[in-house]
């Protein structure tokens, strides 16, 4: 998900911004609505995942709420509340 290395590790606010950009990039216009994806997967480097592991559920809920608010502000339509998951595969 992140193409550059963060010297101090990725921060949750950076993840939130990137997810919102992904939402914007993958919108689909229908006749009267603009739909956006409702499922998002975050890939983290092992060190970053280790830092967030203890509050992964809370962070996922916060990121979901951020995406929901972003969709509302931009008048996007979602089929369900956004779901944010984390892929536990190593990313280098």
Q: What does each model-found stretch correspond to?
A:
Residues 89-91:
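Conserved small/polar residues in nucleotide/adenosyl-binding loops
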């Amino acid at each position: 998900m992140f193409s550059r290395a963060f010297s101090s590790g990725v921060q949750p606010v950076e993840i939130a911004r990137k997810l919102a950009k992904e939402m914007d990039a993958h919108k689909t216009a229908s006749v009267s609505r603009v739909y956006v994806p409702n499922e998002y997967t975050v890939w983290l480097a092992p060190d970053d995942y280790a830092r967030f592991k203890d509050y992964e559920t809370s962070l996922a809920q916060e990121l979901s709420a951020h995406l929901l608010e972003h969709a509302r502000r931009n008048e996007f339509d979602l089929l369900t509340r956004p779901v944010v998951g984390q892929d536990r595969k190593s990313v280098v």
